[in-house]
Structures are given as C-alpha cells and as structure tokens.
Amino acid sequence: MESIYYVMCWACHRKCKHCYEDRFRPYVRGELESVVQEAERNFPRIVANLPARFTYLDQADPHPDGTFPEKTGRIILSGGESLIDPVRERVTYRVVEALRDKYAAQGGVKVVVQTTGDVLTDAIVDDLLARGVWMISVASIDDFHVGLEGPAKQKAFMDKLSAMFERHGMRRSGLSATTRNWHEEPGPVYSFFGATPDSWIGKLWPRGRAWQNGLSKATLEDNFCNRWSGGLNFLRHQWNGSEVSIEPDGAVYPCCIKTKRPIGSLLEDNLIDILESLVGVPAYEAITMGHPERMGLDHGWSEEEFIAQSLTTTPAGTPYQNLCIGCDRFHEQVLGPVLEEARERRRRARALTTPVRPPAVDLAAKDHLCFDACSALPARRSSRCPRTRRKSNGARCSPRPGARPSTSTPGPATRRPTPSSSGPARRSASATA
C-alpha cells in the first residue's frame, strides 16, 4: 500500500466551520473519555489488520530492465487533533509505537502525524521523533482556523513552528502535498498546508460543517474522486497511487471524503482481504479508475442518470451539483446488498482457512483408542501408531501407563505377538487379550 489516512480519534479542540466531519469537535468529561476509549479499544485490531508489509511497487519509476522498485509507504495519523490531552499519550504515541514495531522487520513505514500545530511544544516534538515519526504536517494554514486569518498571522505562526522544528534537527519538506513522491524525502521533515482557495482541497468537500455552512464551492467539473485523497487507485493496493481512509471504529473508505457506506471494517477483516473482495465489482472499479459517473452502469444507472442524481439543494436552498452527491445516492439506493455480498465472501473465505481445534480427549481414552485402532492392523515391524507416532513393536502399540486396556477383538489379519525381551510379553494379560 502506498498510503493510508488513519483518523484515530474524533476528539478535537476546535470546531472549524469548514470541517468535513461533524464529529471532529471538542468533547468534555464522559463524552471525551468515551471517544478516547473507543480509539484505545480499536487501534490494536486496526493495526493488526493492516497489510503485513507496508510497501508498494512504483510503476512511475521503472528500473532499466522493466521491473519496478519496491518503495516504503506512509500512514498519516490524524484526528480530530491527534496531539491534545489525553489523545496524545493514550492513543497517538501508542499507535506510532505499534506501527514501528509491526513494520520494523518488514521494510518499515513512513509515519506522518497531522496536527493543527497550535498544541505543539518542544517536548511533544521530541516525543514524536524519539518514536520514529518521519513527518509532522501542520494542516491549519488557512482563514478558516480561528486565530490564523490572513497572511501575516499565518506567516508568524509558520515561522514560530519552523524554528521549533529546526531546533530538533528537522527540515522543511521541499515538496508539496500534491507532489506524487513527496514522501520519498529523507526525514525527519515538516510541512504546512491548509484549505486555501488554490489548494487541492480549496473548494471544500460537500461534507460535514462545510456542507451545513454552505462553504463548498465545488461544481460538476470538480471530480474529487479522480485525484489524491479521492478514490483513484484505491483497489490497486500493490502499486503506487493506492490510498484508503480508516476511521476510529475501524470503518474503511475508498477516499478521505468518505462514501455513504464503508467498504468494510478492520475490526472484522484484513485490509487486503477487504480490497480484494471488491476487485471486479463494477461500481468500485469505476471509483478506482476515478470515474464515479460510471458506477451504476451494471445496475441500470447510465452516466446521464448518475449526473442527474448528482444534483441536490444545499441547506441554504441553492442548487448544487457534484459527483460526490451521485455517489452518495448510489451507495444509499444500490450498493448495500453488493457490500454485504462482499462481506459474506470474506466470511466464507475465513471459515475455509481458520483451523478447527479438535475436541479435548482425556489421555487414557486417547491411548485406548490408539491401541484399538492399531490392534486391528496387520503387524508391521516398521509401522508407527497413527495417533502417537510411536514405533510399533511388531504387532501393536503399547498403551501409556495407566491407560485402559483394549477390549477389541483382533481382526483375522492380526498376528499374535511372540514373547520376547522387548515385546508385549511384558504387558498384562488383559492388555494383550
């Protein structure tokens, strides 16, 4: 996999009006404890169900012989705000450590911690770098974040953080977040970005508070699916360009924008199994190709119908048309059974590969059964008991001390043992009867 965007916890210290998720907000007392406990409870299973190796083959950088280099992927850890108390100590640091340990002997992983930046301190930067974080990405450089309105405030904020980062030996990333290979720089590095009008997220997704506040300026021409953080290439997990989004409850989505239904859960299934179960499913092949308007062709939705379904009305009552709306409606109306079928396929596959533990058998009964089975076989000097794997003495296996004697009648092919110093003459009469 090249990239995963992992939202670890819903808690945030801000409630920005342009945010794409209503659940990113301040929580207090019991509510805060509840969302932190959810993150704590789920992250071990989520990490366990990530790919065994976090690498990908880069088709954009072939070797002279036509083969493709294997490169290390990245996982972006986000919130909410990933560095507030108590999320930082109880969730973020532990997730970073779990990822480091999981991939240490498997080619590694580039860990990016995304933050608003205003909670950063020298001690926190030190803690992150000590745990092997490759990049700290500050994602608040825009007019929507209270206190950072305007170029002057934004510059002062970036200058302050840059000085802090550089005190710890970090350097500023020379590549933007939209550059395909930005994660190939040697770390540790830091970066800044925000929802500015000229950025890749500047028009804002039709989601969350951005939608409720009428802030999304996207039109039908803005295909969020066919770009980074969209669904483009999400099924091609072994190649460059692959990315999915994961939420605190383990839900997996093909894009950061989030489809109306998750494609699976990491609390149930391995990520690669989830993706493989959707390979060849027309709707999800359309998403991975960056053409959501073709999602419904196999279900009677023409491209014209999909585009018509992409028209809606904003909460303020104005017309709005974007392919994300059509995708939402297609998921709601059609894809529920399709996703359930994929889930059932995964369940059946697990049942075939999960070993069944044999029922417990007491030791004496096990020896007795073994002796009975062996006593019905022709004597072979080199044979072994099929249960205990011990060598036969030429006729039958001897039971362990304390085993119940066999009461079976030898078959016609069974040869009676001849007394010898090492043979069954030492057994009791009842054992050889």
Residue locations for each model-derived region?
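Short cysteine clusters
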Residues: C12, C16-C19, H237, G250, ...
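Conserved alpha-helical substructure of the radical SAM core
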Residues: M1-K110, D122-A123, R131
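Flexible mid-to-C-terminal extensions adjoining Fe-S/redox cofactors in radical SAM and related proteins
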Residues: D22, I263-P378
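Extreme N-terminal, non-catalytic leader segments
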Residues: D372-T414, S430
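Conserved AdoMet/S-adenosylmethionine-binding subsite of the radical SAM
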Residues: D85-N240
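Hydrophobic positions on the alpha1 helix immediately C-terminal to the Walker A/P-loop
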Residues: P419
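C-terminal accessory region of radical SAM enzymes
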Residues: E166-N226, A251, I257-T314
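A cross-family glycoside hydrolase active-site/sugar-binding cleft signature
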Residues: V7, I76-G80, V112-T116, S137-A139, ...
